[in-house]
């Protein structure tokens, strides 16, 4: 999953787009028709009045210009689209319902917190998961006992950036493991990059490639008693 946001600080920014796909952990492929995409009105605009391109809550940053450059439109179009987005609470409920429908049950199993989807994405531990916990606490899906969200698997997370770091750490020509650089190195088309729909599809494809690689190696490496 991936957020597009109105800022770079995960402790304060608001999401404006949230996209996701589901990867089948056994077939190692994107589940058919699992694509999900919603937009969310940012908190700064929820109660703002008289907002215009010359009078808005983002005058202290270039975030509107940045999103405009990514989408190839004027910043005023970005602002106007954000104003039209549905309330974050409603969009968040849709995402919760979406994840509920993808719990993984083993034979005879019951729905528990451990059957919930495993969160995965690029740099999610440092960024996206912090936003998830904030939204869960504000709108629903928060576990007070665990002090975190209850919509994803409580223990397991797969941050693709960490996988990339481990595999690419000793390749000198790779100077950065940003998603854009990794896309370029792997030969992934960057058209529409930084749109959440595009980013989650690319991340899912990269994750699947690494999972298949791990599966292939795991069957060939002698782990048992290897420290004896």
Predicted regions and their residues:
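Short, solvent-exposed loop/turn segments at secondary-structure junctions
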Residues: 124-127, 163
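Acidic two-metal-ion nuclease catalytic site recognized across multiple nuclease folds
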Residues: 183-185, 194-228
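Conserved non-catalytic scaffold segment of RNase H-like nuclease domains
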Residues: 1-122, 194
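A short acidic (Asp/Glu
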Residues: 9-12, 129-134, 206-207
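Short, polar/flexible loop-turn hinges at active-site or ligand-entry regions and domain interfaces
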Residues: 77-83, 142-147, 188-193, 217
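Short alpha-helix plus adjacent loop in nuclease-associated cores
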Residues: 158-173
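A structural motif
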Residues: 171-183
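Substrate-recognition/cap helix-loop segment adjacent to the acidic, metal-dependent catalytic center
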Residues: 127-155
């Amino acid at each position: 999953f991936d957020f597009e946001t109105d800022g770079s600080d995960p402790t304060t920014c608001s999401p404006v787009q949230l996209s996701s796909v589901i990867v089948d952990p056994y077939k190692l492929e994107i589940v058919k028709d699992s694509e999900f995409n919603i937009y969310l009105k940012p908190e700064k605009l929820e109660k703002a009045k008289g907002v215009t391109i010359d009078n808005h809550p983002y005058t202290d940053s270039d975030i509107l210009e940045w999103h405009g450059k990514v989408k190839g439109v004027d910043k005023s179009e970005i602002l106007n689209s954000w104003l039209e987005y549905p309330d974050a609470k409603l969009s968040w409920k849709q995402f919760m319902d979406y994840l509920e429908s993808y719990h993984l049950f083993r034979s005879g199993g019951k729905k528990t917190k451990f059957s919930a989807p495993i969160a995965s994405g690029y740099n999610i531990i440092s960024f996206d998961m912090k936003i998830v916990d904030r939204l869960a606490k504000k709108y629903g899906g928060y576990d007070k006992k665990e002090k975190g969200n209850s919509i994803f698997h409580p223990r397991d997370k797969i941050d693709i950036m960490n996988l990339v770091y481990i595999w690419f750490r000793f390749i000198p020509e790779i100077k950065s493991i940003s998603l854009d650089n990794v896309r370029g190195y792997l030969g992934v088309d960057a058209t529409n990059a930084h749109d959440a729909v595009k980013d989650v599809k690319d991340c899912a494809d990269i994750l699947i490639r690494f999972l298949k690689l791990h599966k292939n190696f795991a069957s060939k490496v002698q782990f048992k008693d290897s420290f004896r």
